[in-house]
Amino acid sequence: MSKLRIPILLVLFIVSCCSAEQCGTQAGGALCPGGLCCSKFGWCGSTSEYCGDGCQSQCSGSSGGGTLSSLISGDTFNNMLKHRNDNACQGKPFYTYDAFLSAAKAFPNFANKGDTATKKREIAAFLGQTSHETTGGWPTAPDGPYAWGYCFLREQNPSTYCQASSEFPCASGKQYYGRGPIQISWNYNYGQCGRAIGVDLLNNPDLVATDPVISFKTALWFWMTPQSPKPSCHDVITGGWTPSSADRAAGRLPGYGTVTNIINGGLECGRGQDSRVQDRIGFYKRYCDIFGIGYGDNLDCYSQRPFGSSLPLSSILLDTVAAA
């Protein structure tokens, strides 16, 4: 078999020189059809050259979901998102456990790296961040504010979120406001995500609010896909990201706080104490407690410079104090 390896790799190299990549970071986070593995070079296949070292997605084939259901049961899911089907919640009864598992089959690396505690910590982090994005809780809410995640489905009082783009042009009459667990917004995000999961979200953005599996897929796509200069949320929370010297100088270290920075750092991070960051942490801690696992280090981003920001951290903090 070793004699065949060189020709196969040579073919991969030749193909890569002559056509566009098919998947992974080289193709905007696109997944391979039929559950095929995405190689480190951005090509789809099922052999060890594709599924082995450096594989980017679907590295175990199209199984997915099974491992996830052994980590979080339907009862645990319902306990975490305890009031999502309350009559006061806009999202009732949209967000289901089965839709979550079904969507995760397209992202088999989700909650599938490291020991059991690491896998559960990723689930807690994902549900914690998305619960904040969709929360219907308030300080004196029944069972506390962190039992009200996944209450909302669509952004309240939305804008159109349309930015001129030749690659992902806005469709006539369509709005790209926040929808679903991660509240995906802007035409370029709908376009990239739709391309990756194989759905035309530019022309049909409301699928994110009408099809629960697609809705969860958009959130998982965002979670699993790095977008330079940001790493993926998945890599950060599972220990797969090593901060550069620039990251360390900006206060960005492995942990839940950097996940918050990836999602909304421009508005929430590097500004000292922030109630939104506290809310994200509150959901995360509750879910970790339900799982019976530790929280890890670096939970907040109060002293982190947002990704892509060239301002000194002290300037961000000073601006915040001056505005207070």
UniProtKB/Swiss-Prot annotation:
<feature type="disulfide bond">
    <location>
        <begin position="269"/>
        <end position="301"/>
    </location>
</feature>
<dbReference type="InterPro" id="IPR000726">
    <property type="entry name" value="Glyco_hydro_19_cat"/>
</dbReference>
<dbReference type="GO" id="GO:0008061">
    <property type="term" value="F:chitin binding"/>
</dbReference>
<comment type="similarity">
    <text>Belongs to the glycosyl hydrolase 19 family. Chitinase class I subfamily.</text>
</comment>
<feature type="active site" description="Proton donor">
    <location>
        <position position="133"/>
    </location>
</feature>
<dbReference type="InterPro" id="IPR018371">
    <property type="entry name" value="Chitin-binding_1_CS"/>
</dbReference>
<dbReference type="GO" id="GO:0050832">
    <property type="term" value="P:defense response to fungus"/>
</dbReference>
<dbReference type="GO" id="GO:0008843">
    <property type="term" value="F:endochitinase activity"/>
</dbReference>
<keyword id="KW-1015">Disulfide bond</keyword>
<keyword id="KW-0147">Chitin-binding</keyword>
<dbReference type="InterPro" id="IPR023346">
    <property type="entry name" value="Lysozyme-like_dom_sf"/>
</dbReference>
<keyword id="KW-0611">Plant defense</keyword>
<feature type="disulfide bond">
    <location>
        <begin position="37"/>
        <end position="51"/>
    </location>
</feature>
<keyword id="KW-0378">Hydrolase</keyword>
<feature type="disulfide bond">
    <location>
        <begin position="55"/>
        <end position="59"/>
    </location>
</feature>
<dbReference type="GO" id="GO:0006032">
    <property type="term" value="P:chitin catabolic process"/>
</dbReference>
<feature type="propeptide" description="Removed in mature form">
    <location>
        <begin position="310"/>
        <end position="324"/>
    </location>
</feature>
<dbReference type="GO" id="GO:0000272">
    <property type="term" value="P:polysaccharide catabolic process"/>
</dbReference>
<protein>
    <recommendedName>
        <fullName>Endochitinase A2</fullName>
        <ecNumber>3.2.1.14</ecNumber>
    </recommendedName>
</protein>
<keyword id="KW-0732">Signal</keyword>
<feature type="domain" description="Chitin-binding type-1">
    <location>
        <begin position="21"/>
        <end position="61"/>
    </location>
</feature>
<dbReference type="InterPro" id="IPR036861">
    <property type="entry name" value="Endochitinase-like_sf"/>
</dbReference>
<keyword id="KW-0624">Polysaccharide degradation</keyword>
<keyword id="KW-0119">Carbohydrate metabolism</keyword>
<feature type="disulfide bond">
    <location>
        <begin position="23"/>
        <end position="38"/>
    </location>
</feature>
<comment type="function">
    <text>Defense against chitin-containing fungal pathogens.</text>
</comment>
<feature type="disulfide bond">
    <location>
        <begin position="32"/>
        <end position="44"/>
    </location>
</feature>
<dbReference type="Pfam" id="PF00182">
    <property type="entry name" value="Glyco_hydro_19"/>
</dbReference>
<dbReference type="InterPro" id="IPR016283">
    <property type="entry name" value="Glyco_hydro_19"/>
</dbReference>
<dbReference type="GO" id="GO:0016998">
    <property type="term" value="P:cell wall macromolecule catabolic process"/>
</dbReference>
<dbReference type="InterPro" id="IPR001002">
    <property type="entry name" value="Chitin-bd_1"/>
</dbReference>
<dbReference type="Pfam" id="PF00187">
    <property type="entry name" value="Chitin_bind_1"/>
</dbReference>
<keyword id="KW-0326">Glycosidase</keyword>
<feature type="disulfide bond">
    <location>
        <begin position="151"/>
        <end position="170"/>
    </location>
</feature>
<keyword id="KW-0146">Chitin degradation</keyword>
<feature type="signal peptide">
    <location>
        <begin position="1"/>
        <end position="20"/>
    </location>
</feature>
